Amino acid sequence: MHPVLCGLAANPALPAELIDRLIAVADTAVDSALALRPDLSHVQMVALASRADDTAVQLAYVGRLTAPDVDPVAQPRAALALLDKRSGRPEWARLFAMDPAVEHREKLAACPGLPPDVVETLAADPDVRVVAELALWTTADMAARLASHPHAEVRRALAANEATPPAVLAMLVTGEGLPPAERCLVCDREATPFVHDQECSLTDCDLPPGASCDGSHESTVHDMQLAALRNPATPAGAVVGFADHPSMLLREQLAARSDLPPEVAGRLVDDPDAGVRGELAENPSIGDAQIRALAADHGYDVRRRLAHNPRVPLDVLDQLAAEIRISSHPLPRIAAASPAEVEEMARSKNPALRMVLAERRDLPNGIRDALALDPDAKVVKSIARHPGLSEAQLRAMVDRHRVRVIAKVAANPDASAALLEDLAGHEPPGHKVFREIARHRNATAPSLLACLASRDARSLAAGHPALPPHVMVELLSHDDWQVAEAAASNPSLPPAVMSELVPGR
């Protein structure tokens, strides 16, 4: 990979004639960067696609190649990508359905809208991987037909397909109405009973760690049950019995279901595994009784996840905010709070609750301004990025709380160039402040030059258009490839310098 050429390939100011020269000399990494450019001509896109299959696939998926641009024999992966986007030709599907390469048939099986005869061919494919891939993506009618397939891997894939009819999903879970599966990937390869080594060292082995079969295909059945529990189309009545299953993974997925009956949720509140209770805590379908019981849970992570439940009552959230460390992202319950609830939280005596409220970016001006004057630095850090704060308010925050808030102040979209320059020279320097300055639209040359001294911010500063051009040129030869690439991608890089960097003049 050539970082400077990769940077130039992504540079929005790169002249059209240099794009042509770059295409002629590009490697795979540069091709990928060029393929993302919105200003490529059709001729340039076709030229790029002809150089590397990966690039052709990339261009096909973003809709920049069409069927006339692709030869399915020379570029099979690009043709399959177009089929996956419903932009390929039906005859291609028939060609790939008979392709000796299993990976091509498997990819085809995942494509939507295939001709019926192609679907029938794939359903009868001799390789179970192809049939399983079809089962994962096929329509309800074919899913119902494949439910009695003798291979457990096909049934596992059907259990994950949301188009599989609910009645069929129930049969897959309970086994009622279906003949027993005859084979699985484990007993296809090994004499049973067999348990695959968790630390298998064979490089050509693709069995999952711990995969096992004693004749009942137990690990595949477990995976099928797990897929069915994750599938919202599976009827709740078919899976409630997993509340007492010995598998923690199955109970976790049951606890996360949006159609969980209240009586089952009540049983899972007392589950011995904290992971199960944590899934339940985040589930917006649980009732007030379960929420309040989980608020008293001894598991820290259970209470943390409960705080992210969009239906948690504010009095419970008040309690949780005082007990646990909550992420800086707005909580769903806070985001959904009514105007009256917002006012109530802004007056809370609990600074942790005021802090999570301050993470919102749509607060009324009066509440925003009141939180900007909060005596608690945690609250001020949260509100500092809120749009609409004046320069005087931002400077007052820094005067009161100093290094504890300067990175958040620097992240405010309305921070002025003068304020950013002052923050860049603040003593002591704040953690992360240089990264925030380097990515800020209002940053000027003096503050960006200060950012270059920070290893964490250097590459961001190198790509900022306000950096002096002579500094960009110096950074093109920097030891850190990310810095050199960022400098080359800078739209303020002089065109003459760009031309010198691209071979083929």
Regions found by a protein language model. Give the residues of each.
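Alpha-helical scaffold segments
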Residues: M1-R505
